[in-house]
Structures are given as C-alpha cells and as structure tokens.
UniProtKB/Swiss-Prot annotation:
Transmembrane segments: 555-573, 628-643, 820-839
GO terms for cellular component: late endosome; lysosome; NMDA selective glutamate receptor complex; plasma membrane; postsynaptic density membrane; postsynaptic membrane
Name assigned to this protein: Glutamate receptor ionotropic, NMDA 2B
Topology within the bilayer: Multi-pass membrane protein
Short name of any one Pfam family annotated for the protein: ANF_receptor
InterPro entries: ANF_lig-bd_rcpt (IPR001828), Glu/Gly-bd (IPR019594), Iono_Glu_rcpt_met (IPR001508), Ionotropic_Glu_rcpt (IPR015683), Iontro_rcpt_C (IPR001320), NMDAR2_C (IPR018884), Peripla_BP_I (IPR028082)
Superkingdom, natural source: Eukaryota
Binding site for L-glutamate: 511, 516, 687-688, 729
Localization in the cell: Cell membrane; Postsynaptic cell membrane
Composition bias type Polar residues, residue spans: 1254-1265
All ranges on the Cytoplasmic side of the membrane: 574-600, 621-627, 840-1448
Length: 1448
C-alpha cells in the first residue's frame, strides 16, 4: 500500500470512530452506511473530517464504512440488504468509479423497496437517470437533464453560436433533453436557429451507413449530442468519417457522454465540450461528508418537529405501514436541507437544485480541461475568444475565415452596453464583445472577463465588411491603453494588440498617422477627421446700443441721406411742378387758400412710411410724386423687414463663445497673456497629442497639466469652467457637441478641422487582408451606405441649430440693392415727369378727339366695351347715326348719342387745367336771379377753385346706365327731369362752394334746389324796415288742387343725368321704392348726400305754413346791394350787355310797387337773360324795365297757345284745357322733331322771325285781351357731335355756361354749350302790359342733347325732384309782417302780386316773367288760375322716372 493511500484510509477510519463515539452519548443516533465501490487505490483516496462537524446537531450520525469491488447489480443489492439486517442502517451514501448508469437504476430500485434514503455521490450512481419511481428515495449529486441542456445553451449563447443541430439516440431522457432545448429557444430573445434534429437508432443492422446518411444532413457549426458514452464513441467515429469532427464544427455533450474524465475514448474529437459535475473543487471526501450531513440534518429536523426519527430497517422484506409514513416524512425533509450555509436541497426528481457544474474541453493533449464554471445560474468561461485555432493542429489554413478583432470604446464609433437583463444576451443590433479582467492572483485555469454588447458607427462598418469579405470574428475590448502609443519601444493599446498578433484587426476611432503606418497596415479612411477645438458657451449681456447694431453706421447715414436729401426733396419738387399737384393749383388760382405740399410734409410722409407709423400725412397728387412715394414704400418694406429680422440676433442675451483661428492662435501659443490664463488640454496617448508634441512643443508642455483622462472627463471640465478649450479628434467632438444636453458645447467654426486626416482599420502587416477590406469600404461609399451610417450615428439634435451666434451687421454691400432701386426710381420718375407734362399740355386733347374732330380713342374703346357687355349694335355709318330716321323709338341710336354727348362733356375745354381762364366766361345775370338764390350766383358760385377729377360726369353716366332698364316708352309716363351740378367734394372741403359773403356758410357748400313748375313769391329787401315780405317758400301748399299751369304737364323728352336716384310713385305709399332710394343714397358719393342733408332743413323751413303778413329779407342787405352793383358794373374786355345796372330797382321800388295794382294779375314770366339781351339790342333808352303792358295785352297773350318747343303761336288752339297739352307742336317743330337733325337751327330761325298772334284767352279766371307782338332774339339750337367742331370755329359772342354751376371754366367760346343757360329774347316789359297767362318761350325744351336755353337743358333738375327728396338748409331770411294787400291770403298769389309791383320799377310796369335763380324754369308766373296736380296724383308728390329722351 502506498503512503498516500494509507493516509486516506486512516482518515476514513477516524471518521467512523468519531461517529461511533457519538453513539455512546445520550443523543439519539442515526445509522448511515457509506458504500464505496472500486479498487483499493480508489477507496483509499478519501479524506478525514473533524470530530466536531456534526456536534451541533441533535441527532448523532453513526457511520459504517463498506467497500466492495463488484459493481454488478446482484452484488450491490446483496450487500445493501445485508447491511440493513446486520447494522440496522437508516441511510446509505453510495459512490463508485464506474461509468455505468445501471448502478443508479439498481439504487433507485432498492430505495423504492426498502424506503431507505440512498444518495449517489460519484460515478455511475450520480449519472442521469430518467423516469424514477414515484416513491423513490434515491437522490443524486448531479444535474438533471434539463439543467444540463440549459448550460449547453448558455455556452452557445456566450460565444454567439446561434445556429445548431440536435443529435440523440433513444436513450431514456432524450425527449426531456429535446423538449427542454426547444422550449428554451422558443421563449428566448436570442435569435436561435435550430437547423436539424436527428434521432439515431443504435439497435438497427448496418448502422454505419444509416448513421452516415443521417449525419451528412448536418451543416450547422454547432451540434448537441445526447446519448451514452458507448453510443457516443460509435457516433463520433462515423462523424469523423463524414468530416464533422474537424475545424468548423463544435460538439457539445452532457455529463452522460463524458463519464469518467480519466478515461477518454480515442473516437472523441478534439475540441469536444462537455457539461460535467465539478470534481476539481468538489472531491469524493467532500461529497461523503455532505452526504452524511444531508441525512443527519433531515433526521434532526424531523426529530425537532415530530420528536421521532425513522426506525431502522431489519430486512428488505415485510414493509410495515408505519415505515411508509415515516419514509415519506423523511423525504420531505431531505429535499430542503441547508448545511453550513450551503443550499444542499434536491428537486422532486432527486437531483440537486444547485449542482456544482463545470464546462470541460478536450484539448489537443487529449485531456479534459476545465474552461468554464456554472454556478448560481451564472456561466463563466476561461476564454473570452474561443481558442478554435489552438484546438486543431492543422487549422492554419482556416485562420483566414475566423478573426480576432480588438476595439476601443469611444462614442459614437464604438458604444459599449450591458447585456439585456431579461435574456442575458445582446440584442440583434449589437455585437457581443468581451472585456478581459486580469486580477493579480490569476490562476492557471484562466482569467475572468465580462461579456458586453458593442454597437456604433465602426461596429456597423465591421459587420458589413465581414459580410462582404466573408469572415467570422470574435470581438474584444482592449485593456492595456487606448489607441496605441509606443513607450520604450513597445506599443500598447489597439496597435499593440495587432503588432503582437493577438488580434488580426483593430477597428474603432483609430487615426491614421505615419508612425502607426510603419508597424501596421491601414485601410482606406472611412471617415474624414482631424483636430478640432471644443468650447463652452457662456452667457453675455445686451449692449445699450443693440437696437442700432442691425445696421452699420454707413447704412443709417445713407438711409437718412436718401430720406432727407434725395427722396423727400424729389417728391416735393415733382409735386410742386406737377400740373395737377397742390402747389400748381395754388399757382393757377384754382384753389386759393387750399392746401400746399411742403418739403416738411414730404419728409413727414416718407418718415411715416419707412417706420410704418399710422400718423396723419398728406399724400401728393402728382403722378410722378406718387410713383416716387410708391417706390419709397417698397424700400421701406425691405428696410424695416431687414432691420426687424436682424434685430433679434442683437437684442437677445448673447452667449459668448471663445473664438480661435487654429492651433497657431495666440490663445494657444501665449495663453498666459490673457487674464485669466487660457486653459486647454487633450487626452494623452493619442494622435492629437502626438501632433501637438511634434509641431508645438511649448504648447504641449503647457497643456500637459490640463490633460484629461477621457473625453467624458473633458466635457465635464468644460461645463464646470475648469477648462476653456478641449482639443481632440474632430469627428468625436462634433458628435459630442450634437448630443450635448442643452447644446452648451460647440466646436469652433462650426466644426472647423485642423491637420485633416481620417479613421482607418489597422490590419496585421502583410496579412493579405488590406486589399479586400479596402474594396469593401469603397463599395460602402459607392452604394451610399456610408452616408446612411453617418446620418444615423454622427448627427445630433444640436446640429439642427447654429453652433454659434454669428450675428453680423448689415453693411452697405448688404443693402445696396434697395438703394439702387431708389436710384432707378428717381430716373424713372424724371422720365415720367417729362411725359406727364408732354401729355398734359400737348397730347391730351388729341387723345380725346379734339384734334381730329372724331371720337377719340378713349371713347372708341369705351363704346366697344359697352357694346360687348350690353349687346348694343354700333352703327358704322355716320349718316345713319345723324339721320332723321334715328327717332326717339330707336333706343340703340339714342344710347350711342348719349354716350357721345357724355364723352364730349368729359372733353370740354377749360377742364383739368385748360389754359383758358374760367374768369373770362363768368356770366352776369340779373340781380333778381342772384337775390333769389345766393349760392347759385354765377359770379360767386365758388370761393375756391374747382379740383378737377378724372371723370367729371361719372355720376351722370352711372345714373343713366342704372335706370335704362326700367324706362318705359310711353308718352303717358311723362315727367320733367332735373339738372344737378357736378357733385362737390364734401361739405366743408377745400373745394366746396362758398357763400356769397362767407365761404364757410353751409348753404353755399350745397347744391341748389330746383324751383320749376311752382310760382314763387320773391322777397326783396324792403326800403322800409318795418314791413316785411312773407316767406317765399312758405306760401306753397304742395298738396293744393290749384297747383298747376299750362305748362304743368311734364315733358317726356328731357333726360335726367342727375346725381339723384330716380324712382316714381308715391313716397309714402311705396315703401319698397323708398327703401331702394335710401339704399342708393348710401351708395352715393358723400358730396351728393351732403347737399341734400343741408337742403332738407332749408326746404322744411320754407314749406312751413306762413301767415300772409310776413315777408323775408336777406340778412346782409347792404352787402347784397354792393354785390349786385359790382356784378353789373362794366368791366374791361366784357360786352356791355353783360352788365346791367339794376340799382334803380332798389331805389325806387317802395311806394310805386306797393300801390300799383295793375300788375297784380301779372302771371307771365320773363327770364333775366331775355331783358339783358333786349337791353343790349335796344340800348339804354329802350330799357325793358321801362316798358309796361296792360292787363288786356297780358290776357290776350294768355289766351293764345304756343308750340311746346318754340315760341310759335298755335292758331287752332281751343283753350278749353287749363293745362297745356304736352303734345302740341307746330308744323315746323314737327318737321324738325328729329332728335339729331343737324339742320334744325335753320328752321327754328325762320320760325322765330314770324310774328305770333295770340288768340283770346280761354282761361276761366283771365279776362280777354289783345295779343301783343313779341320781339324775339335769335334761337340758338345746340348741335349734334358732327357739327361740334365747326361750331367751335365760329365766333360766338355769348359766353358759355357749364352744365355744372360750380365748374365755370369748362367751356371755350364757341362751345355747343354757349346757349345752354340763355333764355329766349322776349319782348321787354311794357308800361301797359298785364301778366300773360303763358310765355311759350320761358318753358321751351329742346329735343337736342345740346339745348339752347336753360329750360331746354335735359340735364337741369326740376323742382319735382326736390319735392320728393326734401333737402334743405337753415333759412337765411328774416320774417316781417306782409303788406296790407296780402292779408288774409294763405296762398302765394298775393305775394306774387306784391312782389311784381315792387319789381316794376318807377313806371309801375312789370316784366312779363320774374326769373328767380338758376332753375330750369326760373320764372315765377302770376297766373291766377289754380294749378292742379295730375289727375292721377291724388294729391301726393310723385318721384320721377329717369329717362334718356322720350323714346328710351
């Protein structure tokens, strides 16, 4: 016996003696048999325990040591039964040195039969046994099938072997093994791939060929095998024949296959991995001791709880019921055992819950080597990279297919993370990488390492290169240093790993430089980098002058120069010299006292525009100045927008950033010159430090004390203010700046790079991998995959913002464009200024058709547009337009002529700056005319110049177009139209008509009211202050049945081009049309409404019922007298007939007028223009004021009827009707009834030359009298457009009169409108004449659109319009008691008589017609007959219908 064996045997003897000594004590004893099967040498290798190991337990174990050499089932059963009979054994600890799993089956059978706990601690007794009996009390020191399958999968997961196959025989437990593997991979997050599952039947004949055929299906690199050791020997032999046991294939087997580690079959391949029970750290004496402790501890627990322990078994037969109960109770305690702090519990199947397992590897020496340990569900392997090349002696030829690659953690190129806590492995987008830990007391069995997961920009590149080049790899992290630095001739870091050939490649943020290229090969750079500088933002302050900083001083000065000197002066000059500007109107006297446009106003206007201030400004009127202001407004938009956009960068609290130009900057080269000193550093042992050391030695020596251990430490130092700048690789710094929280870290110059280089892959020198790797990298660039990776990994959230606040002032170069625009606008304005004057003074009249005598281009275009819109046919032949066939029923022809007339009115000379002064055409009318209506005086109709407008008759034309569709072509629908002056601008405006004495008075800013068709009593200022003339307007009773006259029927051939909205019907009874009228007033110009607003008050006052003993006087009598004296005073260059001295009327009117009753019945009317013309014809000696007519003569005149269009007497008139029919016309007028007959003047002149015999009056209230001949002036008819030019060339002595009372300077001499306001030259007043009932000349209306007289003007409004609209103003009359002759009279006839008497002059004779104001029928009739309304009026006032001639 060898000494060692004797020593082990002595130890076991001492243990037995110890337990026997415990038996002698009073504690209850537990008999336990320890059976060891094997040779003497094996049995002798045992250990001895301390005597006091179980001293603390209440049950004392009594151990019996039994050794035997036979391992057959019969010998084992016989030996155990003998021990039970002899020793009363209560428990068995069994160990053997065989690989026979049959021993475990025999022991399981004995435990079921004897209900004795048996523990298999070694050899065959501890091997896997499937399908134990239900009542079995056999426990094994070993892992179960499921536990071993889990460890095998953990090994594969550790080395990322996810593709595998399963090969099993039909040995019991194979289904459990297969099911465990399947359930694990199905419930795992790891991407397992189970390719094949093969079941081999070892009992078949010709098994070799069948196994070969099945094994040939295997293609996976990892194969899991479950079988017995004998079956495995045969399977490996067949697998070797088919090439499945060499390089590239890894077999993993359970402990059942490995068996006894001391015996290794030759068929087992090298590199075989097995899961085995730990025999290195858990030897047989320790197992024996733990076996005894488990049984003793369970019995002690049972004793403490139940005060009993299982009784010993006397034999293997006759099992008592009490024994069964006690056995089951003991098994429950055996499952849960803890001894000396170690968990020795078992599962229900009898396997240890926490077995001590190891992973063993069959190395090249054909010995089992422990390469890993599995404890507490944690696997630790010896090799962080599987030593595949060390296992196969002929594997040099396969080294190119599996590579070991080293890397270095540095985001974003390599990012290291922990494994997934749920699965314990890496996710799919990561790659397993291992970091080795080298402890000081490292054992021979190998070092420790930590499994991590790597991802990042370089890892993705590595995966794509490996897929392209087709190689596998194991990745690990470098431990000795960083990128690599040569220290004392030895390289460390990743370069050192490649140089020492521990790694084939180095992948990461490895900079290519010359020194490294001498020892390793670099691939082409996959990213460009260099040296960059990172700084931290620091808060700043806002400057007090920040609001001026958006523009430089030059821009501010230039803007004010352009504003004050250039633009404002230019606008002022253009406006001053503009023909339609403010100052030109002042210079021409067209707007005395009106506004002026000064240079101060120009500056204020431009200042308000450039700063967008809502201030009251005065806009220019000239076209050139408007263009200049418009361009300035565009300049202001650009200027203000640029200022506002750039202001935000200066008004915010700016963040200060240190600016450096490069490594040569003085902040780096002379950092101590600054206060405080500039602090900067880098990470040592890198290419950045090497570059600085080689090129800037002083800089390197200064920065050493500020160097940082890592990039993360440097970032913290920057944020905390310990470091002012950090110098490092540009790619890394750009990534860190983009991912920085708060974006406080920035790289200077938005990532400016110095000493540009790149990152590459380091490869072993002359290994042959460089070309393949270069081609793979270039392919990534070509496919665009490299750009995708850069966008994925190298872009941060802060990259979307500006890294620095780089605000700069806008200089002249930035704003030059807008100043160029102003200069171009100045040049364009000069050209426009010249063209404006050229057109205004030279070309304007030609465009309007004055030069050619034909319709101008503007009119032609307007007519064409109107024709296209309204479908009106245009007559091409001029004769067709002017022929008599174009009668009143020809609507289209009349429309065309109306448009031509409107065009002619718009093109009148004297409008819009005509060189002919308007003062030359002021018409002086009678004083009676001016007395009746101050505000309608021709001489003083406006105190301020008329402001020309673009379309003078726009309101008239729009009124015609608006009312055309509602006109009826029936003579029964007759009316008399009203003429309104052109609308003034606004009440109180600079262009409004001022009063006779005060231009600011409201009545003189309004339009006159028509007084036609109603006899009015005229109140003149009395010579004596006590008596007063009654209210002229208040004498009317508008609803009286006696309101009428022979001329009462309204003529239907007169046109209305007024500013009134024309309707017809009862105002009160027709609410709908009244509402339409009100709505139209809302759309009227403000000027058209304002006149009516004032007239409504005045007319309401005048319509108020008055007593007959009241009369009116004008307030300023003396001023009125002086006005008329000056009006009729002869002036230079004016004919005598325009100045008639009427002062004798006022001087002699008192008593003669008052007591003369011969004129009380005067009813005929005489226009002022008639006796003025008569006065010119007969001279001063035959003044019309001195002639009188008797009552008989007046009655004779009244008994005759006259043509409605001319002064011809109708001899066949019966005189039965009180109202003269509107259809009565003489033969000559019927012949000349063509509206546009150009020869009608000749026929009318002949007609005027014939004497007229008035028949006896048939009026019921008028006495018969003789007719008196009347001296008549020549009748001037207005002409159609065709003769317009010819008439202009004639020397017409009569001064023209504008259609609008306000626009006096519209017409030149010879204009077709020269006779518009001229009354027929009737016979002057005679001393014996009585008021005739009718004056045919006073109410003549022309069918021409260019009438001869005011009563023939189709555009003059009638009094009926004012009846409906009731406009007025406050009265300007005094009331005083009427003269005695008017007492008791409520109507206006008495007032008319008194008024006539006062006007009769010294001789007591009166004029036939007393004319009042500028009214369409301006003569007051003294007709006694009551005037009645139309039979259909029912006493109501009717609004008129608009018309364009009677046939429209």
């Amino acid at each position: 016996m060898r000494p060692t064996e004797a020593c082990c045997y002595l130890k076991i003897s001492l243990i037995i003696l110890f337990y026997m000594g415990c038996y002698a004590q009073k504690h209850p004893n537990m008999d336990i048999a320890v059976i060891l099967v094997g040779t003497t040498e094996e049995v002798a290798i045992k250990d001895v325990h301390e005597k006091d190991d179980f001293h603390h337990l209440p049950v004392t174990p009594r151990v019996a040591l039994v050794t035997m050499n036979e391992s057959d089932p019969k010998s084992i059963i016989t030996r155990i039964c003998d021990l039970m009979s002899d020793k009363k054994v209560q428990g068995v600890v069994f160990g053997d040195d065989t690989d026979q799993e049959a021993i475990a089956q025999i022991l399981d059978f004995i435990s079921v039969q004897t209900l004795t706990p048996i523990l298999g601690i070694h050899g065959g007794s501890s091997m896997i046994m499937a399908d134990k009996e239900e009542a079995s009390m056999f426990f094994q020191f070993g892992p179960s099938i499921e536990q071993q399958a889990s460890v095998m999968l953990n090994i594969m997961e550790e080395y990322d072997w996810y593709i595998f196959s399963i090969v099993t025989t039909y040995f019991p437990g194979y289904q459990d093994f297969e099911n465990k593997v399947r359930s694990t991979i199905e419930n795992s997050f790891v991407g397992w791939e189970l390719e094949e599952v093969i079941h081999l039947d070892m009992s078949l004949d010709d098994i070799d060929s069948k196994i070969q055929n099945q094994l040939k299906k295997l293609q996976s690199p990892v194969i899991l095998l479950y079988c017995t050791k004998e079956e495995a020997t045969y399977i490996f032999e067949v697998a070797h024949s088919v090439g499945l046991t060499g390089y590239g294939f890894t077999w993993i087997v359970p402990s059942l296959v490995a068996g006894d580690t001391d015996t290794v079959p030759d068929e087992f391949p090298t590199g075989l991995i097995s899961v085995s029970y730990d025999e290195w750290d858990y030897d047989l004496p320790a197992r024996v001791r733990d076996g005894i402790a488990i049984i003793t501890t369970a019995a002690s627990t049972m004793l403490s709880e139940h005060n009993s322990i299982p009784q010993s078994k006397s034999s293997c037969n006759n099992i008592q019921e009490s024994r069964v109960y006690e056995a089951h109770m003991l098994k429950r305690y055996l499952i849960n055992v803890t001894f000396e702090g170690r968990n020795l519990s078992f599962s229900e199947d009898g396997y240890q819950m926490h077995p001590k397992l190891v992973i063993i590897l069959l190395n090249q020496e054909r010995k089992w080597e422990r390469v890993g340990k599995y404890k507490d569900r944690s696997l630790k392997m010896k090799y962080y990279v599987w030593p595949v090349f060390d296992l196969y002696p002929n594997s040099e030829e396969h080294k190119d297919e599996h590579l070991s690659i080293v890397t270095l953690e540095e985001a974003p190129f390599v990012i290291v993370e922990d494994v997934d806590p749920l699965s314990g492995t890496c996710m799919r987008n990561t790659v397993p990488c291992r970091k080795q830990i080298r402890p000081e007391n490292r054992t021979e069995e190998g070092g420790n390492y930590i499994k991590r997961c790597c991802k990042g920009f370089c890892i993705d590149i590595l995966k794509k290169i490996a897929k392209t080049v087709k190689f596998t790899y194991d990745l690990y992290l470098v431990t000795n240093g960083k990128h690599g630095k040569k220290i004392n001739g030895t390289w460390n870091g990743m370069i050192g790993e490649v140089v020492t050939k521990r790694a084939y490649m180095a992948v990461g943020s490895l900079t290519i430089n010359e020194e490294r290229s001498e020892v390793v090969d670099f691939s082409v750079p996959f990213i460009e980098t260099g040296i960059s500088v990172m700084v931290s933002r620091s808060n700043g302050t806002v400057s007090p002058s920040a609001f001026l900083e958006p523009f430089s001083a030059d821009v501010w000065v230039m803007m004010f120069v352009m504003l004050l000197i250039v633009s404002a002066v230019a606008v002022f000059v253009f406006e001053y010299f503009s023909p339609v500007g403010y100052n030109r109107c002042l210079a021409d006297g067209r707007e005395p006292g009106g506004p002026s446009f000064t240079i101060g106003k120009a500056i204020w206007l431009l200042w308000g525009l450039v700063f967008n201030n809502s201030v009251p400004v005065q806009n220019p009127k000239g076209t050139t100045s408007k263009i200049m202001v418009s361009v300035w407004a565009f300049f202001a938009v650009i200027f203000l927008a640029s200022y506002t956009a750039n202001l935000a960068a200066f008004m915010i609290q700016e963040e200060y950033v240190d600016q450096v130009s490069g490594l040569s900057d003085k902040k780096f080269q002379r950092p101590n010159d600054f206060s405080p000193a500039f602090r900067f550093g880098t990470v040592p042992n890198g290419s950045t430090e090497r570059n600085i050391r080689n090129n800037y030695l002083e800089m390197h020596s200064y920065m050493v004390k500020f160097n940082q251990r890592s990039v993360q430490d440097a970032l913290l130092s920057l944020k905390s203010g310990k470091l002012d700048a950090f110098i490092y690789d540009a790619a890394v710094l750009n990534y860190m700046a983009g991912r920085d929280e708060g974006c406080k870290l920035v790289t200077i110059g938005s990532g400016k790079v110095f000493a540009t280089t790149g990152y590459g892959i380091a490869i072993q020198k002359d290994s042959g991998w460089k070309r393949q790797v270069d081609l793979a990298i270039l392919q990534l660039f070509g496919d665009g995959e490299m750009e995708e990776l850069e966008a994925l990994w190298l872009t941060g959230i802060c990259h979307n913002e500006k890294n620095e606040v780089m605000s700069s002032q806008l200089d002249i170069d930035n704003m030059a464009g807008v100043f160029y625009m102003l200069a171009a606008a100045m040049a364009l304005s000069l050209i426009t200024f010249i063209m404006e004057h050229l057109f205004f003074w030279q070309l304007r009249h030609c465009f309007m058709g004055v030069c050619s005598g034909k319709p101008g281009m503007v009119f032609s275009i307007s007519r064409g547009i109107y024709s296209c819109i309204h479908g009106v046919a245009i007559e091409d032949r001029q004769s067709a337009l002017d022929s008599p066939s174009a009668t009143m029923n020809n609507t289209h022809s009349n429309i065309l002529r109306l448009l031509r007339t409107a065009k002619n009115m718009a093109n009148l000379s004297g409008v819009n700056g005509s060189p002919q002064s308007a003062l030359d055409f002021i018409r002086r009318e009678s004083s009676v005319y001016d007395i009746s209506e101050h505000r309608r005086s021709f001489t003083h109709s406006d105190c301020k110049s008329f402001q020309p407008e673009e379309n003078l008759f726009s309101d008239y034309i729009s009124e015609v177009e608006r009312t055309f569709g509602n006109l009826q072509l029936k003579d029964s629908n007759v009316y008399q139209d009203h003429f309104h002056h052109h609308r003034p601008h606004s009440i109180g405006s600079n262009s409004s008509i001022d009063g006779l004495y005060d231009c600011d008075n409201a009545p003189f800013t309004t339009q006159p009211r028509s007084l036609s068709k109603k006899p009015l009593d005229i109140g003149l200022p009395s010579k004596h202050p006590s008596p007063q003339i009654g209210d002229l307007y208040g004498k009317f009773s508008f609803k009286s049945d006696h309101y009428g006259a022979p001329d009462d029927l309204i003529r239907s051939d007169v046109s209305d081009i007024s500013t009134h909205t024309v309707t017809y019907g009862n105002i009160e009874g027709n609410a709908k049309r009244r509402k339409q009228y009100k709505d139209s007033l809302k759309k009227r110009p403000a000027s058209a409404k304002s006149r009516r607003e004032f007239d409504e008050i005045e007319l309401a006052y005048r319509r108020r019922q008055r007593s007959p003993d009241h009369k009116r006087y004008f307030r300023d009598k003396e001023g009125l007298r002086d006005f008329y004296l000056d009006q009729f005073r002869t002036k230079e260059n004016n004919p005598h007939w325009e100045h008639v001295d009427l002062t004798h009327i006022y001087a002699e009117r008192a008593d003669d007028f008052k007591h003369d009753t011969s004129c009380s019945n005067r009813q005929h009317q005489k226009h002022v223009g008639e006796f003025v013309q008569t006065d010119r014809k007969h001279g001063s000696g035959g003044n019309a004021w001195e002639k009188n007519m008797s009552n008989i003569e007046w009655e004779d005149r009244a008994s005759s009827n006259f043509c409605r269009n001319c002064p011809s007497k109708m001899h066949n008139y019966t005189g039965q009707n009180t109202n003269r029919p509107a259809c009565i016309r003489c033969e000559v007028c019927k012949k000349a009834g063509n509206l546009y007959d150009i020869s009608e003047d000749n026929s009318l002149q002949d007609l005027e030359a014939r004497p007229i015999q008035a028949p006896n009056s048939k009026y019921p209230q008028s006495p018969n009298g003789k007719a008196q001949k009347r001296n008549r002036s020549k009748l001037h008819r207005q002409h159609s457009y065709d003769t317009f030019v010819d008439l202009q060339k004639e020397d017409v002595t009569l001064a023209p009169r504008s259609v609008s009372l306000k626009d006096k300077e519209r017409f030149l001499d010879g204009s077709p409108y020269a006779h518009m306001f001229e009354m027929p030259n009737e016979t002057s007043f005679t001393s014996k004449s009585h008021g005739p009932t009718h004056n045919p000349g006073g109410y003549m209306l022309s069918r021409s659109l260019y009438p001869d007289r005011v009563t023939q003007n189709p555009f003059i409004p009638t009094f009926g319009d004012d009846q409906c609209l009731l406009h007025g103003s406050k009265p300007y009359y005094f009331r005083q008691p009427a003269i005695g002759g008017l007492k008791g009279r409520a109507d206006f006839r008495g007032a008319g008589k008194s008024l006539s008497a006062q006007h009769s002059g010294p001789s007591g004779h009166f004029q036939k017609d007393i004319c009042i104001g500028n009214q369409p029928n301006a003569c007051v009739s003294n007709n006694k007959n009551p005037r009645s309304f139309n039979n259909s009026t029912n006493g109501h006032v009717y609004e008129k219908l608009s018309s364009i001639e009677s046939d429209v």
